[in-house]
Amino acid sequence: MGDWKGYISAVLRDQRIDDVAIVGHSDNRCVWASRPGGLLAAISPQEVGVLTGPDRSTFLQAGLCVAGRRCCVIRDHLLAEGDGVLDARTKGLDGRAICVGHTPRALLVLMGRRGVHGGILNKTMHELIHGLRSQGT
């Protein structure tokens, strides 16, 4: 998928999604593309390392950070064969659903608009990562 800008625009056409980022997780742990001016553009290499690392129990108990925002993990199947999705929610008054999808080379991160249920993002994420996986991304 060479045109990430077009892909980001296509994902953001879904009115339930407020922000999106595509982040490398193997060789290059940086944001490849994101919504211009979006919060998820600030995802750090350290956060990617925590998301894809082998120590799952620490962030399941204490939560994790995505783009500097504290989140509590709802469901972690990010590294599970056949699933590849993590559901979380930002902490604080403006709690938003966060969904992270795993492909062979990248993580896709979605943040829902205020009031959007995480299950809706989860379903959308499964559709999106299926498409990326079929393209080898």
UniProtKB/Swiss-Prot annotation:
A molecular-function term among this protein's GO annotations: actin binding
Cellular component terms per the entry's GO annotation: cytoplasm; cytoskeleton; nucleus
Localization of this protein: Cytoplasm, Cytoskeleton; Nucleus
Main location: cytoplasm
Record's keyword terms, sorted: Actin-binding, Cytoplasm, Cytoskeleton, Lipid-binding, Nucleus
GO biological process, any: actin cytoskeleton organization
InterPro entries assigned: PFN, PFN_euk, PFN_sf, Profilin1/2/3_vertebrate
PANTHER family to which the protein is assigned, alphabetical: PROFILIN, PROFILIN-3
Family the entry assigns: Belongs to the profilin family.
Function, as annotated: Binds to actin and affects the structure of the cytoskeleton. Binds to poly-L-proline, phosphatidylinositol 3-phosphate (PtdIns(3)P), phosphatidylinositol 4,5-bisphosphate (PtdIns(4,5)P2) and phosphatidylinositol 4-phosphate (PtdIns(4)P). Slightly reduces actin polymerization. May be involved in spermatogenesis.
Subunit structure, interactors included: Interacts with ACTRT3.
Protein name: Profilin-3
